[in-house]
Regions:
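Core catalytic alpha/beta fold that binds nucleotide/phospho-ligands
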Residues: 1-134
Length: 134
């Protein structure tokens, strides 16, 4: 059931220091399981990449919550790619074929994303909305 076109919502909060600790402990093995090449390239060009990784981690969690599946059996970390508009800087997500098929089975639509981070926390909010009809 949707409310005025909303199919699902998801929010996630990540402590940036925990992300830094995970990256320091497990390195590329951890990063490669969670983040795609373009996400890694974007984060690594930043002065404190773990803050940007934390925000993208939060987006992936929030998307899985909006879909009502969590991450695991139905969609994985690499099925959700966080993108950034080159002109506006606005975040968006690109879903893999597998995640797109899941979304289609559950009502289609599109995913809207907002993310932010401070020195201590990264937060993401996702709203999964039905496609507009003419």
């Amino acid at each position: 059931m949707s409310v005025r076109g909303v199919l699902g919502i998801g929010v996630d909060l990540v402590e940036t220091e925990r992300m830094r600790d995970a990256i320091e402990r497990w390195g590329d093995r951890f990063v490669g399981k969670i983040f795609g090449a373009s996400e890694r390239a974007y984060c690594e060009e930043k002065g404190e990449p773990w803050r940007h990784y934390a925000a993208r981690f939060a987006v992936k969690e929030a998307v899985s919550k909006a879909f009502g599946t969590g991450l695991g059996e139905h969609i994985g970390w690499l099925d959700i790619e966080v993108m950034r508009d080159s002109e506006t800087g606005a975040p968006s997500v690109r879903l893999s074929t597998r995640a797109t098929a899941l979304a289609a089975r559950r009502g289609g639509g599109r995913v809207l994303v907002s993310l932010s981070h401070t020195r201590r926390y990264a937060v993401a909010q996702v709203v999964w909305v039905a496609d507009e009809t003419a």
